Amino acid sequence: MAAAVPRRPTQQGTVTFEDVAVNFSQEEWCLLSEAQRCLYRDVMLENLALISSLGCWCGSKDEEAPCKQRISVQRESQSRTPRAGVSPKKAHPCEMCGLILEDVFHFADHQETHHKQKLNRSGACGKNLDDTAYLHQHQKQHIGEKFYRKSVREASFVKKRKLRVSQEPFVFREFGKDVLPSSGLCQEEAAVEKTDSETMHGPPFQEGKTNYSCGKRTKAFSTKHSVIPHQKLFTRDGCYVCSDCGKSFSRYVSFSNHQRDHTAKGPYDCGECGKSYSRKSSLIQHQRVHTGQTAYPCEECGKSFSQKGSLISHQLVHTGEGPYECRECGKSFGQKGNLIQHQQGHTGERAYHCGECGKSFRQKFCFINHQRVHTGERPYKCGECGKSFGQKGNLVHHQRGHTGERPYECKECGKSFRYRSHLTEHQRLHTGERPYNCRECGKLFNRKYHLLVHERVHTGERPYACEVCGKLFGNKHSVTIHQRIHTGERPYECSECGKSFLSSSALHVHKRVHSGQKPYKCSECGKSFSECSSLIKHRRIHTGERPYECTKCGKTFQRSSTLLHHQSSHRRKAL
């Protein structure tokens, strides 16, 4: 193999990167081992750092360097280049370990080993790691956050690459060397990391051209109009947040790939809605929206998810291991994006405003879901009955009606529910909690909806009418059940005795006759009842409450049925 030699400039003059660069032909490069190639990259990087730190022009020789950056120096690379009659072998003792090496290149490679050990030592525990990437991975265990900085080692060195010159050099944390991060050589492959203990210098400049740098030091732009949209990708915590779905990323490349799913026309099209994806796996995940398939169930609460990552984040709710904690209230979250959304609740920030009704939202996807109320769009369709929904969660809840799935079970009585909110409301029957108070009469309710229906008793409002007989009702559900009297429909049948009922609640109450179950117990005397309404009526014996008053004579009663019987006596007297 022919000896690869650098170009030799004059003994005294301006030094360029090409003067100290060592070039190999394609055939020569193929003969080098991996270790030799790594050494070559290390030497070239060191030469680049030296030239840059001295302020020398790093472009091609036929380009004119800026006068401010021209400097006359002795050739530093002569110690690395064998000259006629001078042997390259010389004793080079290592100051770190005392090892003596004869070859200057081996000596440089050996010193780099100590340098790596120093750079790859964990500041928290002192542990040495083999590679910078391993160090970054290890540091996550201490700080509990994701971060990503691409290694300068991955940079590709290109012949005669035109490089810009910085007024003052930046310091790359990976190697601790002065390098031009804005140069074409390093700008695309490395990101500058700024820590509290490091002092960063001014932004790079090119003669006759203004340069704009992103505040996060991860990307440089040639115009101010280019940097402003880029900065909007960041949150105040340095996290990339998708404006379409709210998902957050610590790496720009992951964020960019994710956004491609929202915007780019990929080769994988959804047959249901026509949406395109760049990856087949993304299409498969998306199709679960239409099918309602949830492949990853939570063993703690039974809730299912279409993506494994969503399940892992959800499980942190049960374990309480959320690494992202709100400084205002101390609440922890499994994802940084969820913390950011939560913090907007403290600040009151609502960036998304509906032009139709003026309602505001903190999250864009909530705003999009709300807009479907005005547009009538229902993209989520049930495969069983064809019913469509505006939100995915409503489709999942609806499908449980077909499958009979009731994942939320009461530990007190064993009753199961389709929705967690229904379980929470049901548990108040056992605890006696009634958080909703009527301002008119002081009556308490365990559900907000029951309070709203009750308030119509005071206002006299009955907004729901039967289309057959015109009877008015205070809630829509009562109209639906009433209309079955006209149609004769009794869809709920008892499997024990075959008796049919108008409503599912009536069937559930009836089943307690066969099971003997009496879940509602009086705290005063210990008597148990199969129906909640029976317990309420019984309690009036202890409290003395008589809420039903006769308008004719003013007499009061504990039960409405007793009042009706009493009123009939007035009618008989009138006859």
From Swiss-Prot:
One cellular component (GO) term of this entry: nucleus
Zinc finger (C2H2-type): 92-114, 240-262, 268-290, 296-318, 324-346, 352-374, 380-402, 408-430, 436-458, 464-486, 492-514, 520-542, 548-570
Compartment list: Nucleus
Family annotation (InterPro entries): KRAB, KRAB_dom_sf, Znf_C2H2_sf, Znf_C2H2_type
Domain KRAB: 15-88
Compositionally biased region (Polar residues): 71-81
Keyword Phosphoprotein: no
Molecular function as annotated in GO: DNA-binding transcription factor activity, RNA polymerase II-specific; RNA polymerase II cis-regulatory region sequence-specific DNA binding; zinc ion binding
Origin superkingdom: Eukaryota
Major place of residence: nucleus
Keyword Repeat: yes
One GO BP annotation of this record: regulation of transcription by RNA polymerase II
Pfam families noted in UniProt: KRAB, zf-C2H2
Residue segments, region Disordered: 69-88
Keywords, sorted A to Z: DNA-binding, Metal-binding, Nucleus, Repeat, Transcription, Transcription regulation, Zinc, Zinc-finger
Function of the protein: May be involved in transcriptional regulation.
Family that this chain belongs to: Belongs to the krueppel C2H2-type zinc-finger protein family.
Record's protein name: Zinc finger protein 587
Record organism: Homo sapiens
Gene name as annotated: ZNF587
